[in-house]
Amino acid sequence: MLKYVNHDIVFQEFPDEVTLAVNLSQCPNACPGCHSPYLWSDTGELLGLSRLKSLAAQYADEITCVALMGGDNDPESVLLILSELKKAMPGIHTGWYSGRTALPECFGEYPAPDYVKTGPWREECGPLSSPHTNQRLYRYHEDGSREDITYRFRKK
C-alpha cells in the first residue's frame, strides 16, 4: 500500500525533465541525515492509480515526467502503478527514487521506469553530484538496457 504526503514540480531530479515528484510516506530506510524524516511515518493519503493519474493530468501541460519518491516499503506497488501510468499516459516518463542499494526481486516482473535512483543517503558520500556518492541514477531504455547517468549531475 502506498501513501503520499505531498507533491511538487521539480527540475533537478532527472536530467532534461520537468518532474511531478510525489513524496511517499512509510519509508523503512530512516537514513541518518535524511532531509525528509517526516516521510518515515505512516501518514498521508492512499495513492492508487486513479489518484496518480489525476495528479499527472492536473499538471500535464507542465511536466514531462512523474516520479515516486520513496516506496521502499512496497516496491511492487511502485512498479505496478508506474507501469500502469505509462500505459495510460504514453508520452510521460516515469521515475523512482529508492533508498535501497539493490533493486527488489520483483523488479524484472514489470516494465522498468524510465529512471531509477538507488542508494541510501549517506552524508559522508554526498548527493548524486558528488564524485564520492554511493547513490546511482539509471536510465532504462525501451530495449531493457540500462545506463548509469549519475555523471550527468556532476559539474564539468
Regions found by a protein language model. Give the residues of each.
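Structured loop/turn residues at beta-strand edges in well-structured enzyme cores
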Residues: N29, D61, Y110-P111
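Short secondary-structure boundary segments
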Residues: S98-R100, G119-P120
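Conserved Radical SAM active-site core
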Residues: L2-V10, S36-T94, A102-C106
